[in-house]
From Swiss-Prot:
It is an enzyme of class 2 (transferase). Catalyzes the formation of 4-diphosphocytidyl-2-C-methyl-D-erythritol from CTP and 2-C-methyl-D-erythritol 4-phosphate (MEP). Pathway: Isoprenoid biosynthesis; isopentenyl diphosphate biosynthesis via DXP pathway; isopentenyl diphosphate from 1-deoxy-D-xylulose 5-phosphate: step 2/6. Signal peptide: none annotated. This is 2-C-methyl-D-erythritol 4-phosphate cytidylyltransferase. It catalyses: 2-C-methyl-D-erythritol 4-phosphate + CTP + H(+) = 4-CDP-2-C-methyl-D-erythritol + diphosphate. The gene is ispD. It comes from Prochlorococcus marinus (strain MIT 9215). NCBIfam families: ispD. One of its GO terms (biological process) is isopentenyl diphosphate biosynthetic process, methylerythritol 4-phosphate pathway. Disulfide bonds: none annotated. Its EC number is 2.7.7.60. The lineage of its organism: Bacteria, Bacillati, Cyanobacteriota, Cyanophyceae, Synechococcales. The record marks R150, K206 as: Positions MEP for the nucleophilic attack.
């Protein structure tokens, strides 16, 4: 399985003053823990990190202790552009790809393998968890408009997996039509292409705040 890791997080909400994937977590960088999980998945055979040139040496240094090679891909101005750069850098024989946020450093390798397996039967899959909170939809003035049935609500995670040719086609259409999305599955939604939900884990959090980092430390100490 080919694996792409967008890794251009600024760390502004972490007040880190650097790429948040370089923040220390129990003696190693966040990207180290992400790579450890990725390489622990039996389905992984090719990994590319997509990031900004200024972070290249530090990010790749976090990968030096792994037996597998990590390929570097220069990112774009947005996550969407960065992923498209990553897709263009895949080997020509790549048929399937998993895309995973570098800041989700607690991903279980078994979930990675599960997503890879689901791509045998689906052209697009994403990890997600059932929403347990009551969600409110509000108007522009902050007043509640409605409460959707949470039985139909899932919180999207990564990895998200796709057939490479289909995802490249979706990205090219997004460029032509000037679509902007926050994840790749959204492109498939716009095109009315099916995306299969694979139930993930609540521990697969995205590190975006100091609170998240404290939670991650607990999981790393006691997995």
């Amino acid at each position: 399985m080919h694996f792409l890791i967008p890794a251009a997080g600024s760390g502004s909400r972490m007040k880190a003053g650097k790429n948040k994937l370089l923040i220390d977590l129990e003696g190693e960088s966040l990207i180290y823990w992400t790579l450890k999980s990725v390489f622990s998945a039996s389905s992984t055979n090719w990994v590319g990190i997509i990031g900004q040139p200024k972070d290249k040496n530090l990010l790749l240094n976090s990968a030096k202790d792994f037996a597998h090679k990590v390929h570097w891909i220069n990112g774009g101005d947005t996550r969407q552009q960065s992923v498209f750069n990553g897709l263009k850098a895949l080997p020509k024989d790549a048929e399937k790809v998993l895309i995973h946020d570098g800041a989700r450093c607690l991903i279980n390798p078994e979930l990675i393998d599960l997503c890879a397996k689901q791509l045998d039967e689906n052209e697009a899959v994403i990890l997600a968890t059932k929403v347990t909170d009551t969600i409110k939809i509000v108007d522009n003035e902050g007043f509640i408009k409605e409460t959707p049935d949470r039985n139909h609500l899932w919180a999207a995670q990564t990895p998200q997996g796709f057939l490479v040719d289909r995802l490249i086609k979706a990205h090219k259409m997004a460029i032509d039509k000037n679509w902007t999305v926050t994840d790749d599955a959204s492109l498939f939604e716009i095109l009315n292409w099916k995306v299969k939900i694979v139930e993930g884990a609540y521990s697969n959090i995205k590190i975006t705040s100091p609170i998240d980092l404290k939670i991650a430390k607990l999981f790393v100490k006691d997995p």
